[in-house]
Amino acid sequence: MAYCIGFIVTEEAESEIITQEVFPAEVARREVLVQTVRPGETEEAAQNLLRAGAQALVARGGNFRDLQKSVSDVPLVELVMRTPDVLQALNGRVEDYDQIWLVLSKFVRFDFDSCRALLPAKVHCFRYGPVEEMLAFLASLDAPLNTLIIGSGFVLEPARLRGFHAVQTRNSPDGVR
């Protein structure tokens, strides 16, 4: 029997990259399983994937950190979000907005200060640890409605509830491979 890997992601679009673009044959053979989660559902998703036959788990950011505390019986692999992934989310969008906020987990490997000279002044960055910090930031953000929020799947809903446009950062297909 082939090895089975379970991916835990935060948005359906991420799931589609894995299932349709990167690993369609492996998904068809049930060698790759994917589960989309909301905040607080990571450990339950891991257990579901393990019951379904996953022999290793892949997650990123806070989900990966949560699983480090609770999963010890199978390999756990971190899917890392990097600078090119964040910059790709900006691609073609800068001109359309009055302000852009990169709302990124502290686990995203993105050095805003190093990129600052390449980005227009209307691009700002907020880094958060616990999800509660991100929620508090978005709740108090004083920005025009024509603001774009770029971040993980957990950022999208609270940003949209405030009336902001929101786009998710995604790992490139090469990064997932």
Which ranges hold each PLM region?
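Non-catalytic structural scaffold of enzyme domains
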Residues: 1-177
